[in-house]
Amino acid sequence: MLSILKKLFGTANDRTVKKLFSEITKINSFEPAIKILSDAALKNKTVEFKEKLKNGATLDDILYEAFAVVREAASRVCGMRHFDVQLIGGIILHRGMIAEMRTGEGKTLVATLPAYLNALTEKGVHVVTVNDYLALRDSASMGKIYNFLGLSVGCIVAGMTDEAKRIAYNSDITHATNNELGFDYLRDNMKYSMQERVLRPFNFAIIDEVDSILIDEARTPIVISGPVNDNSALYGKIDKIVRLLNVSDFEKDEKLKTINLTEAGITHIESLLIKDGIIKPDTGLYDFENLNLVHYVNQALRAHHMFTIDVDYLVREGKVMIIDEFTGRVMEGRRYSEGLHQALEAKENVKIQNENQTLASITFQNYFRNYPKLAGMTGTSMTEASELKDIYNLDVVAVPTHNKVTRIDLDDEIYGSKQEKYDAILKLIKDCYNRGQPILVGTISIEKSEELSSILNKEKIPHKVLNAKFHEQEAFIIAQAGRFKAVTIATNMAGRGTDIMLGGNPEMLIEQFNKDHNYVAKTAEIKAQIAEEKQKVIETGGLFVIGTERHESRRIDNQLRGRSGRQGDPGKTQFFLSLDDDLMRIFASDRISGVLRTLGLKDGEAIHHPMISRSLEKAQQKVEEYNYEMRKNLLRFDDVMNDQRKIIYEQRTEIIKSKDSYGFLTSATEELAKKIVLTFIPVGSYREDWDIENLTVELHRIFSIKFDHNLVNKNDVTEEDITKLVIQMAHDIYKSKEEAYSSELMHNAVKYILLTTLDQVWKDHLYSLDHLRQGISLRAYAQKDPLSEYKREAFNLFEQMLNNLKELFIQTVYHFHIDLKHLQKEDISLEHKKLQKNMRESREDPAFSKYNAGNSIETYLKPVVSRVDPKDRKPDDPMSWGRVSRNELCPCGSGKKYKYCHGVNE
């Protein structure tokens, strides 16, 4: 019934596209007048558009003419004229939606339309892609169009200086990778002045390969971290013990990707831990004193039994490097968190790096939701349309192809074993190779690609392997995969973003030559050779794409198919499967095995059965739904941290921009003074219950105030009077510092102290949240909702952090002095300039710079409280104690350590 209605009325997508086609005539109506403009007049259109916007016009008012201008500029500069369907894609992107466009339909060119239009507001446009190569390529090729029209173009890649990044981000249009954007956002919020920041306020982002970034990478947060305690030896010891466990000692669930010790396993590992002296005899792994070891054991179990070398990670130059499960690329600089990376290093017997503590983190889900306007392009996203709508409020519109798709998608072939499957794949590859038909073989891991490569080597079939180990060459290899007799093996979607042209890519081949006197002749020769080769490839049937396994996601399978049949080219695709494949084994093996037994399948015989196809599709849908729930759950938890992150980052920016840091100090001083006084002199309490002695100690500890007991001996003194007095005394201390050092220098010092304190407590708070998050799922066993519990406890931790911030900030401000002796006769204003300079230098990008203590503000800020000879301390006068180490006996004579007595609140 539904299919009949769709035929009668069309789908919602059909109706949207039909409506958009009616707008194309408006763009085309400008073409005759724009075509006759000179280059200078065409460029001047940018000035005209900006003037119109300043006079009240909207972007939609100038959309049709602006798109016509970009089309004409592209035609003149690059020799490429936007097709009507590409104009539709541009409108979709401008309106904050996702354009699904098939491979080879020119998504890069489409992005120039909304990028140019939105750049006219002078607020910046980010064109986001998945790797440095694509960012550089697209900024260079499309930048010619923008420059021709008078707009500036920047490109952000790894390893750039802050100054270079600042220039690139201040360009009208900036090409960048999602990773660099995320890290720059975190780094900016660790800087100490607005001038040091590189990013502008968020405006509009166009994400290429949007499904890869917003879906595939959504579960992986980007993290800036710093080292914590060295526990490498313990990881090594636990690794050796876990190797001795039996299969019966643990249970693993491959569907849920979990692993747990059995009762027998707990007993076994406890005996091994006792034998190695790691835990005491007669204690258990889950005893309170040994609970920290559970974390190490669990990560070692995961490393050995849930993670596979050359599938999930590889070892290169003595380092464990993560492989992106979706692209097959090495994720440079990324490390698994929570000790898993250290467990893998112990497993592979390479140097174990220190665990890291999170300094700043954000998921791509929450990073990209910062943009007021967001759009994206991809070849396959309709299968995830509901997720993109639910999480990002992005509608997906499938754009029709310019040429009809002539590719033939053959039915899957299913075999009983992996060997039978490989035999069938080899037979097909031989047939295609002998006829000259190019073949692209897609695998799901490096291990599988190298396994297949080994088979082809034995058969002496020349081929190229494209995987994470050779990602530097991937664009060139994939671009030439359409040549006559080419055989290419690729992991998943490695090389994504680079078109496979039948006969080869002439531009990339031409780039291999130096521009010598034979350059023009060589160029013509290569183009002629490619044209001839293309015709031969078309005669063989075009590119044949072979899938060696079904991926968990239908979308990834569709992306592999989409490598063939670009722009109306001929091509074929087919998947070869076996019951040994991970997806079949985990999700569909029992049902399909039953069908095969019923049908009496013989060795080496393939089967095509509708039930098997349905079972596979159901298995993929099941995994997709599970992964979607995982991402949704991650977002629910990350939203809690994101709300707190926004508050901290906004507050930090406000502090940096502030020209009066004394305002922050005054409000914090008043609030803390009231709190301290009320702690020792509760409202409505009797005078004899007032704890003046400890109030005196606390006021000195926090404010450096020498409080006179006699001030409260008057009968008419109230706690309110004492609070006012404390605030006034604190104010006087600050003013005396201002007189000594100048108000300008004090302003900078207070601002610096506030920012460093904020950074410290925020870092500690993230550490607490990490630990809270790790164990929160256990609350479900107590019939409590883990998310509700996480929200409640995270809020309590946040309040506690803010209280700690105020106290540490106040304590530091009132207990420091600035050492100006080294200045000799230099002016205070010069000291202020030096202080500002050192403040900048002391807090450069923590990901790249080496901290230079000699250039930090700590050179100038020194605590007033100094050590005092113990014999000069009076037990009943804390003022005489000076600085006391926390582990010293308390000078009061109680016999307790200072940290458990008068120092309990420090």
Swiss-Prot record:
<keyword id="KW-0067">ATP-binding</keyword>
<dbReference type="Pfam" id="PF02810">
    <property type="entry name" value="SEC-C"/>
</dbReference>
<feature type="binding site">
    <location>
        <position position="901"/>
    </location>
    <ligand>
        <name>Zn(2+)</name>
    </ligand>
</feature>
<dbReference type="InterPro" id="IPR011115">
    <property type="entry name" value="SecA_DEAD"/>
</dbReference>
<keyword id="KW-0997">Cell inner membrane</keyword>
<keyword id="KW-0862">Zinc</keyword>
<dbReference type="InterPro" id="IPR014018">
    <property type="entry name" value="SecA_motor_DEAD"/>
</dbReference>
<dbReference type="InterPro" id="IPR020937">
    <property type="entry name" value="SecA_CS"/>
</dbReference>
<dbReference type="InterPro" id="IPR036670">
    <property type="entry name" value="SecA_X-link_sf"/>
</dbReference>
<dbReference type="GO" id="GO:0005829">
    <property type="term" value="C:cytosol"/>
</dbReference>
<dbReference type="InterPro" id="IPR036266">
    <property type="entry name" value="SecA_Wing/Scaffold_sf"/>
</dbReference>
<dbReference type="GO" id="GO:0017038">
    <property type="term" value="P:protein import"/>
</dbReference>
<dbReference type="GO" id="GO:0006605">
    <property type="term" value="P:protein targeting"/>
</dbReference>
<dbReference type="GO" id="GO:0046872">
    <property type="term" value="F:metal ion binding"/>
</dbReference>
<dbReference type="GO" id="GO:0008564">
    <property type="term" value="F:protein-exporting ATPase activity"/>
</dbReference>
<keyword id="KW-0963">Cytoplasm</keyword>
<keyword id="KW-0479">Metal-binding</keyword>
<dbReference type="InterPro" id="IPR000185">
    <property type="entry name" value="SecA"/>
</dbReference>
<comment type="function">
    <text>Part of the Sec protein translocase complex. Interacts with the SecYEG preprotein conducting channel. Has a central role in coupling the hydrolysis of ATP to the transfer of proteins into and across the cell membrane, serving both as a receptor for the preprotein-SecB complex and as an ATP-driven molecular motor driving the stepwise translocation of polypeptide chains across the membrane.</text>
</comment>
<comment type="similarity">
    <text>Belongs to the SecA family.</text>
</comment>
<dbReference type="Pfam" id="PF21090">
    <property type="entry name" value="P-loop_SecA"/>
</dbReference>
<feature type="binding site">
    <location>
        <position position="892"/>
    </location>
    <ligand>
        <name>Zn(2+)</name>
    </ligand>
</feature>
<keyword id="KW-0653">Protein transport</keyword>
<dbReference type="InterPro" id="IPR011116">
    <property type="entry name" value="SecA_Wing/Scaffold"/>
</dbReference>
<dbReference type="InterPro" id="IPR014001">
    <property type="entry name" value="Helicase_ATP-bd"/>
</dbReference>
<keyword id="KW-1278">Translocase</keyword>
<dbReference type="GO" id="GO:0065002">
    <property type="term" value="P:intracellular protein transmembrane transport"/>
</dbReference>
<dbReference type="Pfam" id="PF07517">
    <property type="entry name" value="SecA_DEAD"/>
</dbReference>
<feature type="binding site">
    <location>
        <position position="902"/>
    </location>
    <ligand>
        <name>Zn(2+)</name>
    </ligand>
</feature>
<keyword id="KW-0811">Translocation</keyword>
<dbReference type="GO" id="GO:0043952">
    <property type="term" value="P:protein transport by the Sec complex"/>
</dbReference>
<feature type="binding site">
    <location>
        <position position="499"/>
    </location>
    <ligand>
        <name>ATP</name>
    </ligand>
</feature>
<keyword id="KW-1003">Cell membrane</keyword>
<dbReference type="Pfam" id="PF01043">
    <property type="entry name" value="SecA_PP_bind"/>
</dbReference>
<dbReference type="GO" id="GO:0005886">
    <property type="term" value="C:plasma membrane"/>
</dbReference>
<protein>
    <recommendedName>
        <fullName>Protein translocase subunit SecA</fullName>
        <ecNumber>7.4.2.8</ecNumber>
    </recommendedName>
</protein>
<dbReference type="Pfam" id="PF07516">
    <property type="entry name" value="SecA_SW"/>
</dbReference>
<comment type="subunit">
    <text>Monomer and homodimer. Part of the essential Sec protein translocation apparatus which comprises SecA, SecYEG and auxiliary proteins SecDF-YajC and YidC.</text>
</comment>
<dbReference type="InterPro" id="IPR044722">
    <property type="entry name" value="SecA_SF2_C"/>
</dbReference>
<keyword id="KW-0813">Transport</keyword>
<keyword id="KW-0472">Membrane</keyword>
<dbReference type="InterPro" id="IPR027417">
    <property type="entry name" value="P-loop_NTPase"/>
</dbReference>
